[in-house]
Amino acid sequence: MNNLSLANEKTKIQVRGLEFFYNNQKSLKSIDMTIPEKRITAIIGPSGCGKSTLLRVFNRIYAMYPKQEARGEVLLNGENILAPGYSMNRLRSHVGMVFQKPVPFPMSIFDNISYAIKHHEKLSRREMEDRVEQALRGAALWDEVKDKLKQSATGLSGGQQQRLCIARTIALRPQVLLLDEPTSALDPISTGRIEQLITELKEQFTVIIVTHNMQQAARCSDYTAFMFMGELIEHGDTDTIFTKPSKTQTEDYITGRFG
């Protein structure tokens, strides 16, 4: 058993009274939670429980779609990212996201990484090469692609493509990394590599992962949040959530009685 406790952690994200609406229908109900800095927090729960919706609030990606609204507070470093004055560009520089299905850009491996950087920073060619290498090393992909950086990224395997997407995200040096079912489309070997990478990423980033795979949550995360029908049922250190949950609903889900 570990000795983790949210009370002893430095807070990265504080959620207060968060509610979310699709077409005026409430899908998140009064969420209060603390995301600790440079830890891995897993969000679990049955399909439709609101876990991916919650993840998308953390970078306001919902704002791209009509009739979606978040109310309440999501404090990143003490500032409310839902406030009208908090710019989307600033938020994107702080919070990066990797999606379920890897989507490499139809360009070279090198350009996949450099493309996003060019929109945020002006770097010399040497600085860009160094940044691309750092990102690929950070995503545990450098050794596999260092001799083919000019080749198309679409020729990579599924697992390599997902690590490329992670590299593309961390190249911008965000503070928070959101992962939405990052291994659901991958084979077991690729999944294992991504899971190992996730545990390494927390040295530099605050990581939040949504997963249907409870074993993955147990293996990778420091803290776990269980959601059901738009509500946060329980949130605590992963060992306790999986071995001694305080709520019956949590125990029923983890033991397979529903979900």
Swiss-Prot record:
The keyword Aminoacyl-tRNA synthetase does not apply. InterPro entries: AAA+_ATPase, ABC_transporter-like_ATP-bd, ABC_transporter-like_CS, P-loop_NTPase, PstB-like. The keyword DNA repair does not apply. It is an enzyme of class 7 (translocase). Belongs to the ABC transporter superfamily. Phosphate importer (TC 3.A.1.7) family. GO terms for cellular component: plasma membrane. Gene3D superfamilies: P-loop containing nucleotide triphosphate hydrolases (3.40.50.300). ATP binds at G45, P46, S47, G48, C49, G50, K51, S52. Part of the ABC transporter complex PstSACB involved in phosphate import. Responsible for energy coupling to the transport system. It catalyses: phosphate(out) + ATP + H2O = ADP + 2 phosphate(in) + H(+). It is a peripheral membrane protein. Pfam families: ABC_tran. One of its GO terms (molecular function) is ATPase-coupled phosphate ion transmembrane transporter activity. It is found in: Cell inner membrane. Its EC number is 7.3.2.1. The complex is composed of two ATP-binding proteins (PstB), two transmembrane proteins (PstC and PstA) and a solute-binding protein (PstS). GO terms for biological process: phosphate ion transmembrane transport. Keywords: ATP-binding, Cell inner membrane, Cell membrane, Membrane, Nucleotide-binding, Phosphate transport, Translocase, Transport. PROSITE patterns: ABC_TRANSPORTER_1 (PS00211), ABC_TRANSPORTER_2 (PS50893), PSTB (PS51238). Residues 13-254 form the ABC transporter domain. SMART domains: AAA. This is Phosphate import ATP-binding protein PstB 1.
